[in-house]
């Protein structure tokens, strides 16, 4: 059964659904959807989460990731299942169940806002800050370089998918390899960090909100917010790619 499941899932990553030359392979689709997960939200988002909500908020990010897997599957499944062969995604699903285009229009408007805010400004701002502090590159020069690269990717057909196909595996190797390296070479500190995360998730020191119960809720909310920012589960942003 395991081999059969692997054949129907993992082994289909490099196959195309269509024989057309401009169609996307399963791996390109997978890489494009994964590009939003292995990115700024998983690096800067976690650090910001700890800064605001404390170490305990990381635990609630784990909870968000666990339930987010099922949520991401449901939204992608429903978005593809409710497509009419031409349009697919959360907008088409909302239009079908709501029997009005208003919900689809609202989703599109909010998606544009989210793409400009959490989808572009945070990434570009974080990268520009790192380039400025690490290499002394002015922010406006870095922004100009990013603009040129974004233009080159945007004008080409399937350019984004082709770029993600090459970059995402490298990003994933560095991200997962770096994380495992920290755990392997610093096992005692990693164990202490995990213990601190679990402890502060349920028994934090009262600080910002003035009470232990309030701090737990604050830590939980911050962890769930940053978890959604990191994995985008429930936002419907990856459905159109699938």
Regions found by a protein language model. Name each.
Residues 34, 64-84, 91, 95-125, ...:
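Helix-loop-helix module between adjacent transmembrane segments
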Residues 1-36, 51-56, 68:
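N-terminal alpha-helical transmembrane segments of multi-pass membrane transport
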Residues 17-25, 55-56, 98-104, 135-142, ...:
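Membrane-interfacial loop-to-helix junctions in multi-pass transporters
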Residues 20-51, 86-91, 109-112, 212-242:
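Alpha-helical membrane segments and immediately flanking helix-loop junctions
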Residues 56-63, 161-164:
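Hydrophobic alpha-helical membrane segments of integral membrane proteins
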Residues 1-7, 124-131, 135-186, 190-198:
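Membrane-interface loop-to-helix entry segments
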């Amino acid at each position: 059964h395991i081999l059969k499941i692997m054949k129907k899932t993992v082994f289909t990553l490099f196959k195309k659904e269509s024989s057309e030359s401009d169609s996307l392979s399963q791996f390109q689709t997978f890489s494009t959807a994964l590009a939003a997960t292995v990115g700024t939200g998983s690096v800067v988002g976690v650090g910001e989460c700890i800064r605001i909500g404390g170490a305990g908020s990381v635990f609630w990010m784990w909870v968000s990731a666990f339930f987010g897997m099922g949520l991401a599957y449901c939204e992608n499944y429903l978005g593809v299942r409710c497509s009419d062969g031409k349009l697919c995604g959360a907008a088409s699903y909302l239009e079908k169940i709501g029997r009005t285009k208003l919900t689809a229009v609202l989703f599109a408007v909010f998606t544009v806002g989210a793409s400009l805010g959490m989808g572009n400004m945070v990434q570009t701002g974080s990268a520009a800050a790192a380039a400025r502090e690490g290499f002394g590159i002015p922010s406006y020069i870095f922004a100009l370089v990013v603009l040129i690269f974004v233009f080159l990717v945007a004008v080409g057909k399937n350019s984004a998918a082709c770029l993600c196909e090459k970059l995402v595996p490298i990003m994933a190797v560095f991200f997962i390899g770096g994380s495992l390296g920290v755990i392997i070479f610093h096992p005692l500190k990693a164990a202490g960090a995990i213990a601190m995360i679990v402890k502060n998730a349920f028994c934090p020191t009262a600080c910002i909100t003035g009470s232990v119960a309030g701090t737990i809720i604050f830590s939980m909310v911050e962890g769930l917010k940053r978890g959604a920012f990191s994995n985008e589960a429930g936002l419907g942003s990856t459905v159109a790619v699938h």
